[in-house]
């Protein structure tokens, strides 16, 4: 895991029991890729490393509500993506 002071972009692949989170720089360099058990506190812990107001994209799939609530509570700008519309 690298320290990075600039704006971060985060992609989240949310599944029923686990989630994959990838943090990147503005240039697209991967800072961290982790797989966590779905838990609000664990998500908040990983997202704390993304700095203030990270841009987060999350697939709008079944059960995304809790994650969006937790991300927004932590100051993230959340963007929902349609599963069939993202390439």
Task: Spell out what each predicted region is.
Residues 1-87:
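Phosphate- and other anionic-substrate recognition elements at nucleic-acid/protein interfaces
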